[in-house]
Design a protein with these regions (language model features):
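Conserved acidic residues
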Residues: 13
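Conserved GTP-binding G-domain of TRAFAC-class P-loop NTPases and closely related GTPase folds
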Residues: 18-147
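Switch II (G3) loop of P-loop NTPases
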Residues: 1-9, 23-27
């Protein structure tokens, strides 16, 4: 008797990637030569270039905004990004880091949705989840030719 398991096809509409804004001046525990932010950027680039995920939308959560706000005045962004010549402020740091991540996927057909988050802030996270839901609904409507 022949039994076969059903093949399940999973369709991914996007990839949610989380990075910590506060780790720009830290190194990995397992590799003291590797900056955590640089490693996060390399992983983000690899995921976006993966042949199975290359056409999928990328949703980037840049988390720990609260910690970055406190930390940036004491530890300059140039510790990770020597090329950074902007102001040593929260706004300047976020703008530069966000641009650096988005530029990793600058093809015209690749959208990177960036959301600044503070996971301990319930209102912020609810807003983020609502936005992600809207993205998913819009994608599904496009796939069904409703838009």
């Amino acid at each position: 008797m022949f039994y076969s398991k059903p093949i399940k096809i999973i369709l991914y509409i996007g990839v949610i990637f989380c990075t910590s804004l506060s780790e720009y001046d830290m190194v990995l525990e397992e590799d003291s030569q590797m900056n955590r932010m640089v490693e996060s950027m390399e992983l983000f680039k690899m995921i976006g270039k993966n042949r199975w995920l290359s056409e999928k939308q990328l949703i980037l959560f840049m988390n720990k905004t609260d910690i970055l706000k406190k930390k940036i005045s004491c530890s300059p962004l140039t510790s990770c990004f020597p090329e950074y010549d902007g102001p040593n402020t929260y706004e300047g740091a976020v703008q530069f880091i966000q641009k650096s991540f988005v530029e990793l996927h600058n093809e015209e057909d690749k959208n990177v949705f960036v959301h600044l988050t503070c996971a301990v802030d319930k209102e912020c996270m609810q807003l983020v989840f609502d936005l992600i839901s809207d993205i998913i609904i819009t994608f599904n409507q496009k796939e069904c030719s409703m838009l």
